[in-house]
Design a protein with these regions (language model features):
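A short N-terminal interaction module
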Residues: 1-97
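Generic serine detector
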Residues: 19, 38-42, 99, 106, ...
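Short, solvent-exposed secondary-structure capping/transition elements
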Residues: 44-48, 104, 128-132
Length: 171
């Protein structure tokens, strides 16, 4: 299984366990937000207004939770890193589906990562000239599994597809 199946299940179990005061999707969103804010602030050299805004946002979110829950969120961040060290995949999408599940009534469906990989293999070219650009579209609006799969495909084909760059456009 891509990206450490056991660790993903552990993260999902933590989210379910922390649910009660807040819905699982709120816990998931708060956790992801705090992880992103932590990473962003940890690599920013200058502590300017943007850094302060992110720090305030982080503290405001974390302060809604008790000490044990905050410790659990930090532990989950560590598990996430371990999961990515085991392999690249749509980890967050799988954690979301495991902990919250899609809501068919509102049209939420999860594309299995194996389908995303197959789509990348079938739609991306085997070779690309150095001067040409490779572009693709993320046809869904979820966790970016198609983009992750396309990146993985390009990395595995690096002997043919050299020095590629990925740009992301939010529409």
């Amino acid at each position: 299984m891509e990206g450490g199946g056991l660790t993903k299940k552990q993260i999902a179990a933590c989210i379910k366990q922390m649910s009660g005061k807040y819905a699982p999707q709120v816990v998931f969103a708060d956790w992801i937000q705090c992880v992103a804010l932590s990473i962003s602030n940890s690599v920013q050299i200058f502590h300017d207004n943007l850094w302060k805004q992110r720090e305030e946002q982080y503290l405001a979110t974390m302060n809604r939770y008790g000490k044990e829950e905050r410790m659990k969120m930090a532990e989950m961040a560590g598990m996430l890193i371990l999961t990515y060290e085991k392999g690249l995949g749509d980890v967050l999408g799988e954690v979301y589906m495991e902990s919250i599940g899609g809501n068919k009534n509102s049209g939420q469906f999860f594309t299995p990562y194996s389908v995303s990989l197959a789509t990348a293999r079938l739609t991306l070219p085997d070779t690309i000239d150095e001067n040409k650009k490779l572009s693709f579209c993320e046809p869904t609006c979820g966790s970016g599994g198609m983009v992750i799969a396309a990146d993985r495909y390009c990395r595995k084909r690096e002997s043919i597809i050299k020095g590629y760059w990925m740009w992301f456009v939010r529409i």
